[in-house]
């Protein structure tokens, strides 16, 4: 048995992970999202615009016999293609045509995996994705742009088998004050600014 500890940040004190639930437009589609980084989970817990406190739930995942897709082991283009499957960086017809071709070329079939592991995305990285698809960003510096600052690694629970191997440690429940968000996470990130400035210089 191989166990890893993961955290889920949410405004909800009570959470029941359920197979088939979740938003299609999240980074890796429907699923239950967790991270090994407790600080990242705290950010998730209080990142909504409503001034409410949040919660970090602690889980243990038995990864024995689970098929895990780790995007860190693949080219960053495969990760971008996965994001494009679920989240639109632009609404233009040209972007939709180009992104479809990009997905066909670099995408990975994730349907057979129990868990997807990889970087999380934010607004600055979707800006870069949009510019890359438009051929405004050179491949040689794409990874450098995407490594500006720590994105954080997330796990997305996808299959019924993976859900069955996920157990909450209720004694590990942590309350997160909303003030933490104001002090630590709310300011415009340096990462976002640098990503934007660098892409503008290309």
Residue ranges of model-derived segments:
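ADP-ribosyltransferase catalytic core
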Residues: 2, 18-30, 36-97
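A short beta-strand micro-motif
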Residues: 6-9, 57
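Short His-Asn-centered micro-motif
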Residues: 8-10, 34-36
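Short polar catalytic/cofactor-binding loops
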Residues: 9-15, 198
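Active-site-proximal loop/hinge segments that shape catalytic or ion-binding/gating pockets
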Residues: 73-171
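Acidic, proline/serine/threonine- and glycine-rich low-complexity intrinsically disordered segments
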Residues: 187-189
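Conserved small/polar residues in nucleotide/adenosyl-binding loops
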Residues: 191-198
């Amino acid at each position: 048995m191989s166990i890893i500890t993961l955290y889920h940040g949410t405004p909800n004190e009570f959470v029941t992970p359920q197979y088939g639930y979740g938003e299609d437009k999240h980074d890796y589609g429907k699923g239950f999202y967790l991270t090994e980084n407790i600080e990242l989970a705290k950010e998730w817990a209080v990142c909504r615009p409503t001034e409410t406190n949040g919660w970090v739930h602690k889980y243990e995942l038995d990864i024995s016999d689970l098929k895990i897709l780790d995007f860190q082991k693949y080219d960053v283009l495969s990760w971008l293609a996965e994001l494009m499957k679920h989240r639109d960086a632009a609404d233009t017809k040209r972007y939709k045509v180009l992104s479809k071709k990009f997905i066909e070329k670099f995408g990975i079939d994730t349907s057979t995996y129990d868990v997807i592991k990889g970087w999380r995305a934010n607004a600055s990285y979707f800006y870069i994705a949009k510019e890359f698809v438009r051929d405004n960003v050179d491949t040689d510096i794409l990874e450098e742009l995407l490594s500006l600052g720590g994105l954080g690694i997330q796990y997305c629970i996808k299959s019924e088998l993976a859900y069955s191997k996920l157990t909450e440690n209720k004694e590990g429940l942590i309350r997160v004050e909303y003030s933490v968000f104001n002090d630590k996470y709310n300011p415009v990130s340096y990462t976002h600014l640098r990503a934007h400035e660098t892409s503008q210089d290309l």
